[in-house]
């Protein structure tokens, strides 16, 4: 026999379901647009998801949801929504333009050109504004493609020219992994370690790899790091990121243990140094006798 508490809970749940069903796709869209206006992209995305469930063939809902995905850095999902947009409305020019812009930013110049050709093929340039934007975008794509080809040549010939061309290209395609890698390498060749490290850090977020995280950790901690600087903290953070992506990576595990041990010894030694206890400083840096030296002196 159902208890009073169970009956009340079921009645409340039924009421919630009825209220949820009463909210239309149009209502969810209003909520989503309001969330976008207030920069609540996660809230907008949730509302768009509900709208899609209720009206899965509304091309405008997919188009608007792609905006929320882009704001949250979900490029792949944004492109999928734009693809669905033109599936349901092949003549909707704004979707082609937005897709081509994303592909340009990502450094996918061939795909961006193909997208604009598809726009032309489906006669999607319904407005004069769309035509002008498509022409301007096509010129940017051609320029970016030309810069990339020149950068490939300069990369092995002139570090100065390489950095200059990469700077120009990254203004058009800031998420181009190839261009950013080449600028980092050329910056290092010019002796600009700070610039190279900045690009490597961006690459580590765009395309994480254990090798890159290890490199950034060593540079940040041992070369760029100074006492009480954020760079030493960054050195440890890069190794934590490596272990987060690949918990079984032996190199990152070993490096993380070593760096934590060194960091602990340095902090201990600095404390003794502040108190002018010089013998204790040396002992702290050498480590326990049984465990061998922490640092080579």
Please annotate each region the language model reported:
Residues 37, 71, 105, 140, ...:
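Register position in tetratricopeptide repeats
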Residues 24-54, 146-173, 182, 265-294:
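Alpha-helical segment of the N-proximal tetratricopeptide repeat
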Residues 54, 88, 122-126, 172, ...:
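Structural marker of alpha-solenoid helical repeat scaffolds
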């Amino acid at each position: 026999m159902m208890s009073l508490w169970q009956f009340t809970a079921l009645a409340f749940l039924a009421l919630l379901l009825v209220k949820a069903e009463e909210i239309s796709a149009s209502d969810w869209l209003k909520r989503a647009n309001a969330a976008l206006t207030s920069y609540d992209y996660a809230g907008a995305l949730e509302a768009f998801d509900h709208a899609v469930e209720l009206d899965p063939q509304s091309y405008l809902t997919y188009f608007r949801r792609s905006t929320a995905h882009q704001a949250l850095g979900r490029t792949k999902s944004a492109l999928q929504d734009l693809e669905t947009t033109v599936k349901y409305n092949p003549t909707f020019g704004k979707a082609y333009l937005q897709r081509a812009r994303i592909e340009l930013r990502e450094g996918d110049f061939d795909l961006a050109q193909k997208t604009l050709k598809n726009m032309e093929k489906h006669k999607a340039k319904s407005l004069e504004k769309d035509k002008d934007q498509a022409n301007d975008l096509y010129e940017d794509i051609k320029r970016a493609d030309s810069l990339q080809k020149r950068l490939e040549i300069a990369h092995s010939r002139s570090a100065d020219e390489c950095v200059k061309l990469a700077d120009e290209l990254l203004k058009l395609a800031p998420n181009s992994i190839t261009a950013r890698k080449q600028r980092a390498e050329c910056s290092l060749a010019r002796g600009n370690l700070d610039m190279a490290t900045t690009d490597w850090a961006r690459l580590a977020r765009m395309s994480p790899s254990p090798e890159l995280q290890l490199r950034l950790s060593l540079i940040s901690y041992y070369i760029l790091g100074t006492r009480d600087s954020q760079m030493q903290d960054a050195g440890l953070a890069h190794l934590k990121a490596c272990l987060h992506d690949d918990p079984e990576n032996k190199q990152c595990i070993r490096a993380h243990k070593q760096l934590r041990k060194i960091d602990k010894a340095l902090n201990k030694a600095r404390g003794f140094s502040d108190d002018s206890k010089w013998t204790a400083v040396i002992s702290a840096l050498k480590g326990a006798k049984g465990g061998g030296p922490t640092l080579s002196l």
